[in-house]
Amino acid sequence: MNSQAVRIAVIGAGWAGLSCARLLQDAGLSPKVYEATKQVGGRARGLQISLGGKVHSLDNGQHLIVGAYACFRELFARYGDPKRAVFRSPDFNIRHSLGDGPAQVAGQATKTEQNDSTCKSMRLTQAKTLQHCQAIALGRHSQPGRLRKALALSLAQLAWLQGAKHIPFGSLYELAALMRFAKSNPPRASCAVNDWLDPLRLKHSLVQRWIAALCESALNCPREQACALRLSTVLNEAMASAELDASHWLQQNCDLGELLAKPLLEGRTDSDERRHSGPLELHGSSRVLKLISVNVRPEHRGGINHEPRPAWWLRIAGSEQLEGPFDHIVLALSPEQALALVQASLSCDNMTWLASLAKRLSELPKPLGILTRWMLLQRKPLSDKERRPELLLRERGAAAWLFPRSGSDCAGLVLSAQRDASEARREADEIQARFGIQDIDFKDIYERQAATPSTYGTDWPAFDRFKAASLWLAGDWVGDGSGQSLPASLESSLRSARACAHAITDAMT
């Protein structure tokens, strides 16, 4: 089939929808993107927030881009502005509250007898000397041999351990055991975190709270419900990978919309390499109410002697005329939005496929919320190098991350795996009081349906599960067919979108 004649609708202009459409357009196709709102980026978008009488360009902030995320890096290298972000080796503080009294003020090393007894301050980074040795071990080999990879892996783990500061030896020993265990004992998808870690007999409360915090922030799931397989994937990518920059964190000086969503939408208008590198065809404020499918024979479109294929139309809110027909539909929505759309579309010719998709979507865990409290901090300005992220751990209650915003006096306090907005705000108030985080002004951004929890026994639907109906799935809750078990994240969203784009493109050849 002539690629110019292939009609593709991408529903949703989040990171998944935009990246899928961009890759399709790069391949010479002409997708149309339909977005219900006026703003692109989905749940990873920019926001204009007023703090202290000044408007700051921030974002909804709940997504962390941590680890060797090849798909993000590939797209960012092609479309992003390198001045907007850098990848750096992790370097963050851990403050572990041991009691009920006030802890030290954020960003200040206040040392009183009360503070020393109630809050343990630590630091976790990678030793640069061992990172240099790791680079030598890998050499310039794109595919290093088994011995080189084993040596590089050992050096990577040692770099973490040597870079740790003020962490008790017992806790450090258990962290080392955890890293080895994650690499050598991959669990099943049906295995719970607590069952998987039971043989380690972890005793130190710091390690226990750190694991719980990792489940909350990376898997958006309470530890008792968390999937061991996806936790092990996070541990292996972040702390037990032979790749030199596997654990590097992205530090951006712009909001998430400016980082990648808008560049994907706008393309590379200055590029001479690709004829299709211009802006995507975006239909904003176009809510798709219903999918309408009719099976037609290819001869109706110029072919002969072939089985009927689905042709799709879209019913758009506020429009009497249907959009279409389309040869392919890419659903790049949240599970809840996709389910509502599919249930409204069950009367079409492909009802069996849609009913199966609706059943699969209804089986996914309900999303939990994430609170990001953007604060204008009341403290002496520090350079970006001096302002480290902080992991705030308590003996009871939710953990939180405090992320300083590059180039400003703002910081985001992030609480994940939350079930209620009011309770999340109360937890944030307690954490601020407990750790002495003083702000001049703040603004709470609560994403009620932030990400699908990575509960044990849950498998992500495959991106091509419904390819026979020319219906494709893209999103952070979709499997990309690689066999890697990532939690719901921006990277998993991009990987599923890439898989969709490649599959549709391959079908044209």
Which stretches of residues belong to each language-model region?
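N-terminal Rossmann-like FAD-binding beta1-loop-alpha1 element of flavoenzymes
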Residues: 6-33
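Helical element adjacent to the flavin cofactor pocket in flavoenzyme catalytic cores
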Residues: 237-318
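Conserved FAD-binding subdomain of flavin-dependent enzymes
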Residues: 52-87
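Glycine-rich FAD pyrophosphate-binding loop
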Residues: 25-48
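Conserved Rossmann-like nucleotide-cofactor binding loop
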Residues: 16, 39, 336
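Conserved flavin/dinucleotide-binding core of flavoenzymes
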Residues: 48, 106, 121, 127-128, ...
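Mobile amphipathic helical/loop "lid" adjacent to a hydrophobic cofactor/ligand pocket
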Residues: 73, 77-78, 82-228
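Mid-domain catalytic core of redox enzymes
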Residues: 27, 286-425, 429-430, 434
